[in-house]
Amino acid sequence: PAGPEEEIRELIPQMEMYCEKHGGEFLMYGLSEAQFALLDSWYPGRYQIEYDRDAADYIYESEKLCTLSGKKLHGKRNHINKFKATYEDWAYEPLEEDNLEECFQMALKWRNENGCEDDEEKNCEMCVTLNSLRLFRELHLRGGVLRVHGEIVAFTVGEPVSEDTFVVHIEKAFAEVPGAYTMINQQFVEHECKGYRYVNREDDAGEEGLRKAKLSYKPAMLLEKGIVTKVLEVSE
């Protein structure tokens, strides 16, 4: 649940009652340590949480994602420099009304090239991506696109989640354009995340390749999230 704390507190017992009425198990997904601490302060000992490493969000300092400074990110800077040297006509621009349809078509092409139709998980992910573009204005999202030879080769979509944190929901790039992922990552933060101390690039879903990629950017912290269940009452 989301909203004012007092309303959430009142809603929890109603959620429990709903689950009991319909024969379902009471579960809450994606709670952080701070959120569970608040829940436990309201209802001491009533709930328990099990954290899932695969669901942990990667939180980065926006300045470091923008500048890629330091020895640990030297390889990323090399990727950026090579990209700029290879594609001298590259360009970054914000995702707006006039390029939204073009970005949508790029996403469709990406889906076809990556076998999403034959992979249920990938297909579901692309449904979210395409719907985010369809409802881009209604959801008040922000985005950015990367062009090479005038064509969109990468794009990113996200939104602010607090005064100091911006979350990146979607990032897609053509694999045949080396460095496109690194470039859109850096450019998006530079242009769209100014004023935010942190960038949340979400979880890795337990995918080894994605985990390696996210760790390579040296996150400032991992935000653990877990599944909350009721503590079983043991009858004497």
Predicted features and spans:
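Aromatic (often tryptophan-rich) hydrophobic motifs at membrane interfaces
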Residues: 141-231
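Short catalytic-loop micro-motif centered on adjacent basic/acidic residues
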Residues: 27-28, 93, 198-201
